[in-house]
Structures are given as structure tokens and as C-alpha cells.
């Protein structure tokens, strides 16, 4: 596959974290406006926000978010960050993207939860107008927060369902807070008909993935731990659950150490629906184009297979049938070569 063609082909991204995907140059602008000190040297700034190829573990990887979050505590900063992610998506040939973020992590300077969501949606929509990339938002509850606080995020997702929030996610420490910790929260989301995509099996165990599906998730973020529990693969196939795989990130965090361990082919051969994502464009120093090129190198991925992975993403996207139909036509048209 040729990188320039892969970049041009319309792609769908469903697993992209706002706070992990802001260009260092944009972050510098955001920080300077708030008088937040940061390294003058571009390389030093990059080292602050880009994780090394091999982190000691997931927590080591996540330290890159600490500085970024200190900069994302104003409406202006959040709007600029969201706009920046859409401009990157446009350069990457992304036709549709779902950008996720945790509102509870942006309240340090007194922003109210609805103000936070409004700021991000404003940036996304401005980006859509300027660059032609369709986008929606997903709200994350942080697993370490109080249940009551997470329930507020579920209600928030419901309140903004007409203006660009299309789903709910749980992110954070999966080992200490497995899915059944949140049975009531997820029951509320199901009751309010909020689509669920949950982080599960990034670390921890395959049972977390099965439990997340049982609790209503139609998509799973990562799901890598399923490789060690093949008994759950049939459940995901039967329920037509989409696995949002993020290759670069999964190696960086130490979720897998070698290519032989990476379960991409195992999942495909088991008949599971898989899609490819960046996770964190800046922290993982990647693009969706780079992710597909990695698969081409590792598995000799073909254009037909890339198209199928893109269609898997579209099928699992939290969009209306009409919106999917238009994007489907765009994908089919682009692959006529």
C-alpha cells in the first residue's frame, strides 16, 4: 500500500482522545494565552507530551496527559483543542471522527460541566465547517470518580444528545474498577438509550470485555486481553460487538510486547468486527494513515482489507442510517481504482 493513497482514502476514526491528540504547537498557543510556563525548546515540549515507543506500563504512558490537562481548563482552550483535532483529521483523510473526553477532568478553574461540553462541541463544529470532516463527541466517565459523579456524566450525554454527543464511555483504572463496579451507571445509560463504547481488556482480563458487553456495550475500546480468553470470542461475534483496536498505543503501554502476541489476526479469523484507531494522536505520535501502514508492514494488509476495516468502523459508528449511507457511498466511490 502507498502511504499517499492511504492518506487520501476516506477513513473513519472511533477511538480518539481529545486530551491526547493536540498538536504541540497548538498546546503552546493555548498555554501561552493562560501564562502557563512550558519548555521553550520544541523538542523538550514534545518529550513532555509524546510517550516513548516503550513505556514501563499504562500509568507511565498516562503521565503525558498531566501537563496537557493543566492547559485544558478554559472554554477557549477546549474549543481550540477540539478544532485542532479536526484539522489533523482532515490532513489524515478522515471522513468521520468521534472524539472522546472526560468532562470531570476540566473543572479545575471553575468551568461547569455543560460549559465544558459546549466548548468542545463548538470547536468540533467549527472544524467541521472549515475542513469538511464530520464529527461527534463521546463523554467519558472516569472509573476512579464517585458513582454519583459518573451518573452526572451519563445525564450530561443525554442532555446533549441532539447537539453532538452520541455515546458514553468509561475510561481509567480498569484493574481496580472492573465493569460490574458500574452496573447501576450503565443501567442508567441503557435506560436513557445512550450508546455505550467501553474501555475494557486494555489491561486486566478478558472477562472485563465480556462483562462490558453483557452490561450493554456495543463497542469495546482495545479488548486486547481477549487474546488469552478465547472462550469469550463467540459472545462478541454473536452480539456483533466492534473492537476499537489501537496498534501503536497497545505496544507503547506494554499491553503487548511482541507482534506475535498482537491479536489482530486472531480476532479477524474468529470473525470479529475490528476497526483501527489512533487512541492519542500526539501522545502516541501517530495518525490513522500511520496505523494502516503499520498493518500493511506487519500483515501485508491490502486495500480491500483496509476498506473492510473502514466499513466495520462505519457500521459501528454512532450515526443515523442516513448519515451512514452517505459515508458508505463516499467510501465505495473512493475505492474505485
From Swiss-Prot:
GO-annotated biological processes: adenosine catabolic process; hypoxanthine salvage; inosine biosynthetic process; nucleotide metabolic process; purine ribonucleoside monophosphate biosynthetic process
Co-factor note (free text): Binds 1 zinc ion per subunit.
Active site: 202
Catalytic function, reaction form: adenosine + H2O + H(+) = inosine + NH4(+); 2'-deoxyadenosine + H2O + H(+) = 2'-deoxyinosine + NH4(+)
GO molecular function: 2'-deoxyadenosine deaminase activity; adenosine deaminase activity; zinc ion binding
Cofactor(s) needed by this chain: Zn(2+)
Gene3D superfamilies on file: Metal-dependent hydrolases (3.20.20.140)
Binding site for Zn(2+): 15, 17, 199, 279
Superkingdom per UniProt: Bacteria
Pfam families reported in the protein's UniProt record: A_deaminase (PF00962)
InterPro entries: A_deaminase, A_deaminase_dom, Ado/ade_deaminase, Metal_Hydrolase
Site (Important for catalytic activity) residue list: 222
A cellular component term, taken from the record's GO annotations: cytosol
First-tier enzyme category under EC: hydrolase
Family: Belongs to the metallo-dependent hydrolases superfamily. Adenosine and AMP deaminases family. Adenosine deaminase subfamily.
Record-linked NCBIfam families: aden_deam
Protein name: Adenosine deaminase
Species name: Enterococcus faecalis (strain ATCC 700802 / V583)
